[in-house]
Structures are given as C-alpha cells and as structure tokens.
Amino acid sequence: MKKIAQGIVRLRKLILTVAILLLIPSAIGAVATRINYDILTYLPQDLDSMIGEVVLEDDFHLASTGMITVEGLPTNELIAMKKDIEAVPGVTQTFWLSDVIDPSIPTEMLPADIQQFMFGKNDSTMMIVRFDGPSASDETMDAVAQIKKVLRKDCFFGGMSVILQDTKALINQEMPFYILCAVGASLVVLFLSLESTVTPLLFMLGLLFPIAYNFGTNIFLGQISYITEALATVLQLGVTMDFSIFLLHRYQEEKELRSNNEEAMISAICKTMTSISASSLTTIAGFLALCAMRLTLGRDIGIVMAKGVALGVVCTVVVLPALILTFDRQVEQYKHRTVIPRLTKLSYFVSGHAKTIVAIFLVLLVPFAIAQQKTEVYYTLFDSLPQDLTGIVGTNKLGEDFGMTTSHFILVHDDLTASQVSDLCDELDEVDGITQVVSLDSITGPGFDTELLPDSVMEILQSGGYKLILANSSYKTGTDAINNQLTEMNDCIKAVDPAGVITGEGAMTKDLIEVADVDFAHVNVWSILAVLLIITLSFKSISIPVLLVASIEAAIAINMGIPYFTGTQLPFIASIVIGTIQLGATVDYSILMTTRYHEERAFGRTPKQAAQQTLEHCSQSILTSGLTFFAATVGVAAISKMELLQSICLLISRGALISMAVILIVLPAALMLTDGLIRRTTLHWLVPETTEKSEKE
C-alpha cells in the first residue's frame, strides 16, 4: 500500500488531470441513463398481475392508457379535441362513443352498460387514450405532456400514465434543489466543524468526482429508478463524507510527525485505507443486501449505492490527497475557530455511569422495539404525491363521476362461450365494492355478430387469444378491502378459467404488498449477516460484531418506532430500505469507536480510562460526520413535495442523529462493561503483559 501511496503523491497532477477528463464520459453516461418512474415494473415477472400486464401491452395495447373526463363540452368540440389528441405522436387511439355508434343518438337509447361506462355525473363523458409504448416510456411521457396542452377547459386527465408523467416533471423540477440543499447544508456543518475555510470546499470538490462517476457508470445498468436518482447524490455525499474526514484528520496528525507534507500524506493514505477498509466494506455489504429483494427496485438502489461507496473510497485515497496537497497553502492560510468541541465532560460522565446508562437505554428501547412492529405503512405511492397534480386530480375525478376509484383488467381465454363470460360477469358484479363489469359479451348480448363491430372496439375487448373484462371498483388501491375483493374475484375467475388473470394497479399493488412483506424480512437478515461477517473478520472477534450491530439495530428500532407514537404512516419502500441504509451508513461510527477503544486498551489503560479517552478523541469526527449526514438529508426532507422522498430523507436524517447518540453515549459504556467478554472472544485483543498491567490498575 505504501508504494501505491507514494505513486499517488508523486503523480498527483496527472491524477487530477485524468480525474477531470473522466468527468466528460461520466456526464455523457449520466445523461444517457434512462430514469424509470414506474415502481410497479420492478415486480417479479412471474406474478399473475405482471403476466396480465404483458398481455395487455402486447396484444391489447392497453398497458398504458389515459382516461379523460370531459364535462359539459359540446359534441362537435369534443370530436375536434379527439382528433387533435389522435394526432399526437405516441397515441395509438382515442376511444369514445363515436367509435361505436353515431354520437347524435340520444343516450337513453344506448345499452345500459355503455351508458354507465361512457357517461357519468356532472354531465360528463369519458374518453380513453391508448398509447403506443408502456406507461413509463419516454414516448408515452412526451405524448401525455402534449395532450395536456390540447385539452379544453373542464377536461380532467387521469390514469397511471398521466401520474407517472407528473412524477417525472416534479422530480426534474425539484432535483437541482435537492442537490443544492444537501450541499449547502453539509457545507454549513463542515465550516463550523473544520478549522480551515478551504477544506469544506475541497471536500465537496472531491465528492464531485465519485458522484459523477457513479451516475455516469449507471449507463451499464440501462436504467435506474427515480427514487434511486433522487437519493443517490444525497446518500453518497452523507455516507462517504466520513472517509474524507478520516483522511484529513490523519494527514493533520502525520504533519506533526513527518518532515514534509508529502511524507505525511503517504502515511495518511496508508492509515486511512487501513481504517476505512472495514467500515467501507460493511457499508457496501449493507447496500448490496438490498439485492436480496424480489422487488428489483432494491437491486437498483443497492447496486448504485454500493458502487457509489466503492468509488467514494477510491477517490478519497486517490483524488482527494492530490487536491489537499495542491491547495495545502490555502488550507493553512485561511483558518477559523471551530464550533463543534470534543465532548470531554460527556466522556467522563459516560465512563463514570456506564451501568446506569446501559440499563436506562435497555428500558427505553423496549417500547420502541414494540412500536416498530406496529408502525403503519402504505403501498399506494400516488398518495405520496401532491394532490393537485393533473394526474391525481383526473384520477380522483374518474372516481367521483364514474365510480372508477380502481379498475381491474381481467383476462380469460377466448374459447370461453358468451354464456360463460356473461355468467362470470354476473358473479363478479356481485362481489362487494364492484360498481360495474364490462365485457364484449355483456355489451353485445347473446347471438350478436361481433364482426359487425369496428376493429377499434374489437382490439380493446378481444385480442391475442384473450377476452378482456373490465371491472370497476369503489375501493381504493392498497387497502385491505380491495385486497379481499381481488381474492374473491380471483376465485370466481379460476373456477371458470384456471389460466385467467387479474391485472391493473389494484392487483399489482396487492402483489407488491405480499412481495414487500417477504422482502422486509430478507433484507434485514442479509444486511445483518453481511455486516456481522465483515466485522467478525476485521476484529477476529465473536462478541464485537454482535455488540456493534446490536447498537445500530437498537438505533434503527428507535427510529422506526417513533412514527407509531406520532401517528405517521410510512411508504412501504421506506420501511424496507431504511434499516439497511442506517446500518450501512452509521456502522462506520461504531467501528471507529471500537478501533480507538482497542488502541487505548493496548496502551495499557483500564476499560474505564479507555472508554473515556475513546469518546473524547472520537467525538469530533463522529459529530462532524453524523451532523453532515443529518444536514444533507434533512434539507431534502424539508423542501421535497414528494412525501415518499420526504419520508425516506426524514427517517435517514433522524436515524443519523439517533445512531450518533447511541454510538457516543451507549457504545463506550457497553464496551467498558463487556471488556472481559471481548477479551475472551477476540483473537489477539490484548497481549498478556498489557492485560495483566490493566487488571492491576
């Protein structure tokens, strides 16, 4: 490692040049990486709802649709608007009454099913827009944006495709502010905690490289989710800031011991790499545990963040030293007093009251651990969006005027007879919460020659060997009521056609709930096991990994239990990923604390003295790192209009503070009290002479 460090210091100008040049392909890769705004596409492809979604898309071209509620618009204007919409690139068809019969025929003369389906309250009628591509495709997004401009007054545009386009527009609008807020808040903490005014700017400049490289290399993944895109910069900034702080502190210590700055930096690089190798590996392992999720959104977040941490480590020991040495004179020239102190008084208090602190903590932990299991989550991510968005307003309007709170798409094989389909529709109509059931056979009636219907109608109701049945529900997606409804409907369908499936937002969300519940358990287990293994190998200990992981898991339990007491519902994805993120991001603090405690014991200090010295000397680094992580994420939580991102960032920021408090107050006390157990379960913890000396003292 020393030869590598010498090469880094010697070739620092070349390194900076190459690092800057690499920003160019990174920018190209970042721009070319597609962003996916549809969370439901991350469901396992073998689920019935996803199989049905493929059939809807490939055979019926209905996987991406939009519904327009039109109130009080004269027929001639409505038909003119229909033609304008059909002219938009990316639109396959705009379906309305005029595609079936002459719109001048009085509505009273129409079949009851058509009346109920096409006409609603408030003198409203409905148009269905079919798009060429999937809901989250760029073509569909562009088409939705164009249609919004074409719509007349008192037209309400709803459906999945519209909401996804709204999400994209909102993210693109807010993303620059997320980054500015995270960087600005982090700089404030760094200016207050670091002596040099220039150092925080160097840190941010140094983090620009791994963040840019991370986004640029996402091109090899093909696409990333909008959640990953929104969180990656903030998380990478907060998580990898530790490494920069550790390098700086090591460099400052080595400058006092070495004859010149270059020798000091070589030594600092070697010692930093040694100290951050375990912590970075645990962080990477924590994020990679998300890959155990069947919901592949976890793999998306996990790979991007693990890659970001790895790039952060490389840039910390390669690019940042070159920056610090280049601007070393300016760093020394512009200095000020720091605000964040060493916690000397607290260190004596903790070491003097270790048993009391641990006992109180364990008692306080119990209600939070119980509350964590009872915290409510929601799965309808559209509820996390501002309710004044075009797609949300339009979708709510469909529920008000047509009773289409949720629409189920049922696919059965076309070899079922008209009477079988009709009987099935009657059964489905009897299910609680179903407001209407529409199929080709229920509209035409028995004996009707379907060849008389226009192709545009047939394509919607029968295609690719399947018949489509549309069932509208008054129940909201993601609720127990609609999940029970779907189970009852599925029983009816399987009795007639064992290969029949239900798809649509309601069915996919039900599958999402079932998958997420399993994922939650898997992710927690894998992340804990991975971190335990790495800490075990690093410290060659059985007890230390359990102690450190237990400390962070206790902090996570407190963090996840608080929403129960405040009556706050969490988005399901937050409940799955927050434990892994908090464990991976803050286990560094516990490793730093334990490493220092080991050093103090090796110097011959008693457990009490070692705990006091450890807390005093580690407090500034942990406070700086923890407060920076808190500032970066709480700023985003404060400004985001998306409740999903707001909730995740708030949990992360609060988790950083709780983990920081537990590591600073509880862990030193726990290390001190379990010192005997640690010695018996750790290889080469203390040499015999040191142990005897300590025990005599």
Residue spans for each PLM region:
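Membrane-embedded transmembrane helical bundles of large multi-pass transporters/channels
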Residues: 1-35, 41, 91, 112, ...
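Structured non-transmembrane domains adjacent to transmembrane bundles in polytopic membrane proteins
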Residues: 44-161, 376-378, 382-544, 550-569
